[in-house]
UniProtKB/Swiss-Prot annotation:
Biased composition (Basic residues): 63-72
Binding site for Ca(2+) 4: D533, D535, D537, K539, E544
Catalysed reaction equations from the record: L-seryl-[protein] + ATP = O-phospho-L-seryl-[protein] + ADP + H(+); L-threonyl-[protein] + ATP = O-phospho-L-threonyl-[protein] + ADP + H(+)
Record protein name field: Calcium-dependent protein kinase 16
Binding site for Ca(2+) 1: D424, D426, N428, E435
Length: 571
């Protein structure tokens, strides 16, 4: 799917690059977004400026933007939604029964118009029975000229159904249809867009305390989506509405028109999103849930300083900034912003998605968590994925990770402590097979059979007592790439300390005998050593050990663990 953005020349941001020497105007936003599907139909061009524009006052879908990466300037085909197949007289959407209720007119009365676009309109409506006011998106079936347009509508309804009940997602009530239209009935949000509140603030900035409250709510949405195997793909201030005009009103995510489901380990290869918020890996056509976290990092940066972290006069220029440059944390007001806030934003704007904080990890960060409750932190899908991968690692890789886990301090383990506590339901300090089953066998994008869950617990349970304690959990759940990216000096220290647990004589190498002594493995140890011995000198150097820790999947090298192993002690 292709993307095309509104002209970046009309937008402003934070001047960082030497190629952009001119000061930026105040934060304003131009939205000009050709619609992707009937679910994303707000196609009007709006100049956002707090001096002249009224606030939005209801739940209304806005068309997500599509763009092209700077390299190659390749634009993908976009099928015209107004075109029809040769000989086709009835639009595809009018020939399809969506399976939705057919009694909309009997249940609701349409009121004032809230917004409109190429595919339809959004209205205030009233429930005839209860008198409750709702938002109704009316989508014209005649505009659904191709099957994918119908699938987009069905997918968005499915997503809204899945997320309904989350405190920070606009509530879905029902979907209806008649011969001409589809009606999506949702919660009415009358507090306006997050974007409008940013623009209304002095210098378009939030206080740190207020910004943290907003960011925490966005992260909760992202974490819930990711746990369900869903990526929002268009996180930006325009897609968050306040329930009411009250200052402490909850924030509600809306516009899931670009959202899609993804299986663990898979990537999206199309380019979707909005220029200022798009992640580097999206432009490289290899994106996943991490891209949502990047977008929240951009929003966090804007909330704190009133400027965009990546800016240029053209869209291609913005993309180059995103791919090559780092955000500026030196100019005002950053010197007056807390180190904790800066650390948080930096860890969300890491260009390598593997080293970026996950949404659930970010919720454990001290800057966001202050005033929050650990019980509010959801299970991190990446932690569950790491545990699933741990069983696939060779014995040597598992032992190395256990050694590394013992070198980390409480601050470094704060997010994993939250995750452990979330899985340890009975709070007895260990994870049982049943608790592991509850965490791994839920309605995730994948469901594991009981035998598979037992296999994972057995692999993590290094002392074979039938439970997983916190140390064992850390070894299996660690994000090694993050350790190195966030603090390279600490990474050097921690990885060396882990290496020295194997290097018993302190000569700077791990020999086969030292490997046997540390692991307690019986039988031939050479196959295990050869796995990490890149230069084939019969021993493992510190550099080779670090490479072992970084390697994604050691078993892909087809090295078999020695038979008859026996774990003599816990690492």
């Amino acid at each position: 799917m292709g993307l095309c953005f509104s002209s970046a020349a009309k937008s402003s941001g934070h001047n960082r690059s030497s190629r952009n020497p001119h000061p930026h105007p105040p934060l304003t936003v131009v939205k000009s977004r050709p619609p992707r599907s009937p679910c994303s139909f707000m196609a009007v061009t709006i100049q956002k400026d707090h001096r002249t524009q009224p606030r939005r006052n209801a739940t209304a879908k806005k068309t997500p933007t599509r763009h092209t990466p700077p390299h190659g300037k390749v634009r993908e085909k976009v099928i015209s939604n107004n075109g029809r197949r040769h000989g086709e007289t009835i639009p595809y959407g009018k020939r399809v029964d969506f399976g939705y209720a057919k009694d909309f007119d009997h249940r609701y009365t349409i009121g004032k118009l809230l917004g409109h676009g190429q595919f339809g309109y959004t209205y205030v409506a009233t429930d005839k029975k209860t008198g409750d006011r709702v938002a109704v998106k009316k989508i014209d079936k005649a505009k659904m000229t191709i099957p994918i347009a119908v699938e987009d509508v069905k997918r968005e309804v499915k997503i809204l159904q899945a997320l309904t009940g989350h405190e920070n997602v606009v509530r879905f009530y029902n979907a209806f249809e008649d011969k001409n239209s589809v009606y999506i009935v949702m919660e009415l949000c009358e507090g306006g867009e997050l974007l409008d509140r940013i623009l209304a603030r002095k210098d378009s900035r939030y206080s740190e305390r207020d910004a943290a409250v907003v960011v925490r709510q966005m992260l909760k949405v992202a974490a819930e989506c990711h746990l369900r195997g869903l990526v929002h793909r268009d996180m930006k201030p325009e897609n968050f509405l306040f329930k009411s005009t009250e200052e402490d009103s909850p924030l509600k995510a809306t516009d899931f028109g670009l959202s899609d489901f993804i299986k663990p380990g898979k990537k999206f290869h199309d380019i979707v999103g909005s220029a200022y918020y798009v992640a580097p890996e999206v432009l490289k056509r290899r994106s996943g849930p991490e891209s949502d976290v990047w977008s929240i990092g951009v929003i966090s940066y804007i909330l704190l300083c009133g400027r965009r972290p990546f800016w240029d006069k053209t869209e291609d220029g913005i993309f180059k900034e995103v791919l090559k440059n780092k955000p500026d944390f030196r100019r005002k007001p950053w010197p007056t912003i807390s180190n904790s806030a800066k650390d948080f934003v930096k860890k969300l704007l890491v260009k390598d998605p593997r080293a970026r904080l996950t949404a659930a990890q970010a919720l454990s960060h001290p800057w966001v968590r202050e005033g929050g409750d650990a019980s509010e932190i959801p299970i991190d899908i990446s932690v569950l994925n790491n545990m699933r991968q741990f069983v696939k690692f060779s014995r040597l890789k598992q032992f190395a990770l256990r050694a590394l886990a013992t070198t980390l301090d409480e601050e470094e383990l704060a997010d994993l402590r939250d995750q452990f506590d979330a899985i340890d339901v009975d709070k007895n300090g260990v994870i049982s097979l049943e608790e592991m089953r509850q965490a791994l066998a839920k309605d995730h994008p994948w469901k594991l059979k009981d035998a598979r869950v037992a296999e994972i617990l057995q692999a993590i349970d290094s002392n074979t007592d039938g439970f997983v304690d916190f140390g064992e959990f850390v070894a299996a759940a660690l994000h090694v790439n993050q350790l190195e990216e966030h603090d390279s000096e600490k990474w050097q220290q921690r990885s060396r300390a882990a290496f020295e647990k194997f290097d018993i004589d302190g000569d700077g190498f791990i020999t086969a005998e030292e490997l046997r002594m540390h692991t307690g493995l019986k039988g031939s140890i050479e196959p295990l050593l050869e796995e990490a011995d890149i230069d084939n000198d019969g021993k493992i150097s510190l550099q080779e050990f670090r490479r072992l820790l970084r390697t994604a999947s050691i078993k892909s090298r087809n090295v078999r663990s020695p038979p008859g192993y026996l774990i003599s002690r816990k690492v």
